[in-house]
Amino acid sequence: MAKVKMKTNRSAAKRFKVTAKGKIKRWKSGGAHYNTKKSSKRKRHLRKHTYVKDNMLKHVKALLKEF
C-alpha cells in the first residue's frame, strides 16, 4: 500500500513563514483592533515579527509538514 502524504494545514501556512535558516517566523497578536487604549510604543512593537519558541516548534512544524 502506498504511503499517504500529510496535507499542510492551510491556516498555519498563512500565519507562519520558514526562514532560510529554518526558523519559523510569526507575527505578534493584539494589534488588529481596540488600539486607542494602547500606547504608541506598544503598537509599534506589535507591528514587528518574532520567532516561534522552542517548546512550540514541534507542533508548528507538524502543521507545516516541516519534519
Swiss-Prot record:
It comes from the Bacteria. Keywords: Ribonucleoprotein, Ribosomal protein. Pfam families: Ribosomal_L35p. Disulfide bonds: none annotated. Residues 35-45 have a biased composition (Basic residues). The gene is rpmI. This is Large ribosomal subunit protein bL35. Belongs to the bacterial ribosomal protein bL35 family. NCBIfam families: rpmI_bact. InterPro entries: Ribosomal_bL35, Ribosomal_bL35-like, Ribosomal_bL35_CS, Ribosomal_bL35_sf. PROSITE patterns: RIBOSOMAL_L35. GO terms for biological process: translation. One of its GO terms (cellular component) is cytosolic large ribosomal subunit. Residues 22-45 are annotated as: Disordered. One of its GO terms (molecular function) is structural constituent of ribosome.
